[in-house]
Amino acid sequence: MHLYTYLYLLVPLVTFHLILGTGTLDDGGALTERRSADATALKAEPVLLQKSAARSTDDNGKDRLTQMKRILKQRGNKARGEEELQENQELIREKSNGKR
């Protein structure tokens, strides 16, 4: 029973000691120093992008976002322009007339 009392007191003390990082590793380095060095080595470097480099461009080197804004403005912020709608309606009429 006396042994269990010592273990009961020793286990939380050792655990607390390791959590705080005051324990040492086999090579003599402190636990927290080793972990912080590893974390620093693995930390990703921030990537700074210029505004133009962050946007995708088409084959001609033009900015796709700017082109889409321009196209939507011309269409009146509709998904399809008037010409495309008329062409689609004509195709639907032709197909429906062909089935009869």
Curated annotation (Swiss-Prot):
Modified residues (4-carboxyglutamate): 83-84, 87, 90, 94
Principal subcellular localization: secreted
Residues annotated with Asparagine amide modification: 97
Record note on cofactor: Divalent cations stabilize the toxin the in alpha-helix conformation.
Protein residues bound to a divalent metal cation: 83, 87, 90, 94
Region of interest (Disordered), residue spans: 52-100
Additional record remark: The mutant Gln-89 consists of the addition of a proline residue which is hydroxylated (4-hydroxyproline). The mature peptide does not contain cysteine residue.
Designated name of the protein: Conantokin-G
